UniProtKB/Swiss-Prot annotation:
The lineage of its organism: Bacteria, Bacillati, Bacillota, Bacilli, Lactobacillales. NCBIfam families: L9. Binds to the 23S rRNA. It comes from the Bacteria. GO terms for biological process: translation. SUPFAM superfamilies: L9 N-domain-like, Ribosomal protein L9 C-domain. One of its GO terms (molecular function) is rRNA binding. This is Large ribosomal subunit protein bL9. One of its GO terms (cellular component) is ribonucleoprotein complex. Belongs to the bacterial ribosomal protein bL9 family. Keywords: Ribonucleoprotein, Ribosomal protein, RNA-binding, rRNA-binding.
């Protein structure tokens, strides 16, 4: 029997996948609401869902690209002040959370701190490029300037 998975079933199929399974197992999955029979109506509904998902994904990608342009346009530099020693090393460090808060304060742009790909907190003064993963395919760079208080 041909079925369409409505949920992921480990070892058998993923949500939205169409597969041919033995009748007994297919009926079991249908009763569990993990699959439905692949008739013409269900197939067209699945195609519609896939088109909607593709459209939504394209919109998210476009939005991420626009946000990247907005972040990198002009000379946007996040200015931060911190206490530092004589050799230019900071007392403490600058984290992605602080950068996110400062970006929102200065430019009104909200970025989740988890999207910033700082390998380790910033401990030196000067300019630093911080990569931000906005989407699977889109990565922007925020320029951060750390100066002494």
């Amino acid at each position: 029997m041909k079925i369409i998975f409505t949920e992921d079933v480990r070892g058998k199929g993923r949500r939205g996948e169409i597969k041919e399974l033995p009748d007994g197992y297919a009926n079991f999955l249908i009763k569990q609401n993990k699959a439905k029979q692949a008739n013409a109506q269900a197939m067209s509904q699945l195609k519609g869902q896939k088109r909607a998902e593709a459209r939504k994904e394209a919109e998210e990608l476009e939005e991420a690209k626009k946000f990247k342009e907005l972040l990198e346009s002009g000379e946007r530099v996040v200015e931060m002040k911190a206490k530092a020693g004589t050799d230019g090393r900071l007392f403490g460090s600058i984290t992605s959370k602080q950068i996110s808060q400062e970006l929102e304060k200065q430019y009104g742009m909200k970025i989740d701190k988890r999207k910033m790909e700082l390998r380790e907190p910033i401990r030196t003064m000067g300019y630093v490029n911080v990569p931000v993963k906005l989407h699977n395919e889109v990565t922007a760079k925020i320029r951060v300037h750390i100066s002494e208080k």
